[in-house]
């Protein structure tokens, strides 16, 4: 359990690989060739991302290239996993990993650690949350691929023509935040009901004493700043700014 007031660090992560096996361990004999991860602290993206391409010790399967578009030629001058392993471990250690179909990526990560005799398992240094399982619980009986969730939740994934680890991690971060309630709560999560009651009382008090208040009209600069802010809110909420919707409704009447 995270102590009160300690920042919650989450890493949204995705990998691309040389391929996978249809039978047996899906990772056996294959390699990670790309890692993409984005950091969130207290449900806010920090920009402290981790993105790297990795040179494997085997060719990339043709079927895998069709999925992610990463060829042997693109990886020829990239570092091998042993050169970046410690940097990667330091980045994820102690965080909650958010991964769509986590057993796939975690299986590969643990396999790579094992090949280097690091004696590390991902779930021993991180808490792992499978967002695919979350989605299946929230939307039982429906398709819950990343693309399907984007369509369902109204998230733009138009740039996702091929799978790419960093882009997929960025999209998954949007999906996760939307599935779990959007932006950070305005109130302390430990006292939500108390905070709401207090605000309601303040609103009632303000209404009671507002009858004789002088109405001030904004000047042109203030009005433009307000409109610019509404446009920003509408962009950040992907067209779901209630104020903008209400203004549009009023204009039609």
Curated annotation (Swiss-Prot):
Cofactor: Mg(2+); Mn(2+)
Cofactor note: Binds 2 divalent metal cations. Magnesium or manganese.
Sample GO molecular function, one term: DNA binding
Name of the top EC class for this enzyme: transferase
Catalytic activity: DNA(n) + a 2'-deoxyribonucleoside 5'-triphosphate = DNA(n+1) + diphosphate
Binding site for a divalent metal cation 1: 14, 16, 168
SMART domains in alphabetical order: EXOIII (SM00479)
Binding site for substrate: 14, 16, 63, 68, 168
GO BP term, pick one: DNA replication proofreading
Keyword field: DNA replication, DNA-directed DNA polymerase, Exonuclease, Hydrolase, Magnesium, Manganese, Metal-binding, Nuclease, Nucleotidyltransferase, Transferase
Function: DNA polymerase III is a complex, multichain enzyme responsible for most of the replicative synthesis in bacteria. The epsilon subunit contain the editing function and is a proofreading 3'-5' exonuclease.
Name of protein: DNA polymerase III subunit epsilon
